[in-house]
Amino acid sequence: MSAKAEHYDVIRKPIITEKSTMASENGAVVFEVAIDSNKPQIKEAVEALFGVKVKAVNTTVTKGKVKRFRGQLGKRKDVKKAYVTLEEGNTIDVSTGL
């Protein structure tokens, strides 16, 4: 499957935190994805961009906090994260760029 332009719109960037590093030991990779993307789109994009087989996709939406900026109330953006579990024997090196 070849990578299409819309696959780059679905997958924004890899998330490298302590929690995602622990998840990578169990064969999972964490990505920030478009807020309107769904699990089948995320699975298709990861398989096309990285050439791996995806076992499961779990998603979370973190709501943006309300913060003050120069006395004005503002809201940070909502962030959607996808925990992508890979099939046995497949790996993704997230330190390389998309």
Curated annotation (Swiss-Prot):
<keyword id="KW-0689">Ribosomal protein</keyword>
<dbReference type="InterPro" id="IPR012678">
    <property type="entry name" value="Ribosomal_uL23/eL15/eS24_sf"/>
</dbReference>
<keyword id="KW-0699">rRNA-binding</keyword>
<dbReference type="InterPro" id="IPR012677">
    <property type="entry name" value="Nucleotide-bd_a/b_plait_sf"/>
</dbReference>
<dbReference type="GO" id="GO:0019843">
    <property type="term" value="F:rRNA binding"/>
</dbReference>
<dbReference type="GO" id="GO:0003735">
    <property type="term" value="F:structural constituent of ribosome"/>
</dbReference>
<keyword id="KW-0687">Ribonucleoprotein</keyword>
<keyword id="KW-0694">RNA-binding</keyword>
<comment type="similarity">
    <text>Belongs to the universal ribosomal protein uL23 family.</text>
</comment>
<dbReference type="InterPro" id="IPR013025">
    <property type="entry name" value="Ribosomal_uL23-like"/>
</dbReference>
<dbReference type="GO" id="GO:1990904">
    <property type="term" value="C:ribonucleoprotein complex"/>
</dbReference>
<protein>
    <recommendedName>
        <fullName>Large ribosomal subunit protein uL23</fullName>
    </recommendedName>
</protein>
<comment type="function">
    <text>One of the early assembly proteins it binds 23S rRNA. One of the proteins that surrounds the polypeptide exit tunnel on the outside of the ribosome. Forms the main docking site for trigger factor binding to the ribosome.</text>
</comment>
<dbReference type="GO" id="GO:0006412">
    <property type="term" value="P:translation"/>
</dbReference>
<dbReference type="Pfam" id="PF00276">
    <property type="entry name" value="Ribosomal_L23"/>
</dbReference>
<dbReference type="GO" id="GO:0005840">
    <property type="term" value="C:ribosome"/>
</dbReference>
<comment type="subunit">
    <text>Part of the 50S ribosomal subunit. Contacts protein L29, and trigger factor when it is bound to the ribosome.</text>
</comment>
